[in-house]
């Protein structure tokens, strides 16, 4: 298996629940290395830019409003088959369909406020990482 990087967001509703540490512990227990992370409060412009592929869809404005409603934690995770394994750990986008023990089953409040985001492909991960992390902000872990 190839070592990949994927991008993760702990969304405002999960940050408000004080479960950042619990989510990080689950990332590490699943074998991911956290190679970059920071907390920030998105501006409307940042949220619209990040979710630009959804512009014009009925849920877009509500998504932007939610994602700017409080701080988020963005992270870069590294590991074998990281994109798919991270998505498996997150669970279904709609928490009503998320399997027990997944992050969305445990921390989501609704389809919009589903607690977490994860890249859906290696290409998306690279684009999303570059959106939030500059050169030198992601640190390879050699130990």
Curated annotation (Swiss-Prot):
SMART domains (alphabetical): NDK
A single MF term (Gene Ontology): ATP binding
GO cellular component: cytoplasm
Subcellular compartments: Cytoplasm
Record-annotated active site: 117 (pros-phosphohistidine intermediate)
Catalytic activity: a 2'-deoxyribonucleoside 5'-diphosphate + ATP = a 2'-deoxyribonucleoside 5'-triphosphate + ADP; a ribonucleoside 5'-diphosphate + ATP = a ribonucleoside 5'-triphosphate + ADP
Database matches in Pfam families: NDK
Purpose of the protein: Major role in the synthesis of nucleoside triphosphates other than ATP. The ATP gamma phosphate is transferred to the NDP beta phosphate via a ping-pong mechanism, using a phosphorylated active-site intermediate.
Single Gene Ontology BP annotation: GTP biosynthetic process
Cofactor: Mg(2+)
NCBIfam families: PRK00668.1
Tagged with keyword Magnesium: yes
Primary gene name: ndk
EC number: 2.7.4.6
Residues annotated to bind ATP: 11, 59, 87, 93, 104, 114
This protein's name: Nucleoside diphosphate kinase
Keywords on record: ATP-binding, Cytoplasm, Kinase, Magnesium, Metal-binding, Nucleotide metabolism, Nucleotide-binding, Phosphoprotein, Transferase
Organism in which the protein naturally occurs: Escherichia coli O6:H1 (strain CFT073 / ATCC 700928 / UPEC)
Similarity field: Belongs to the NDK family.
Subunit structure, interactors included: Homotetramer.
């Amino acid at each position: 298996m190839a070592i990949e990087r994927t991008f993760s967001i702990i969304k405002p509703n999960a940050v408000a629940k004080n479960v950042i540490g619990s989510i990080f512990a689950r990332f590490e227990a699943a074998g991911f290395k956290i190679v970059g992370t920071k907390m920030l409060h998105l501006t409307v412009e940042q949220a619209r830019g990040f979710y630009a592929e959804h512009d014009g869809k009925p849920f877009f404005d509500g998504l932007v409003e939610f994602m700017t409603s409080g701080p988020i934690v963005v992270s870069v995770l590294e590991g074998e088959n990281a994109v798919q394994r991270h998505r498996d750990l997150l669970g279904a986008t709609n928490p009503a369909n998320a399997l027990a023990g997944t992050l969305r089953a445990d921390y989501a409040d609704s389809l919009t406020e589903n607690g977490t985001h994860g890249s859906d492909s290696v290409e998306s991960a690279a684009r999303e990482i570059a959106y939030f992390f500059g050169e030198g902000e992601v640190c390879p872990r050699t130990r």
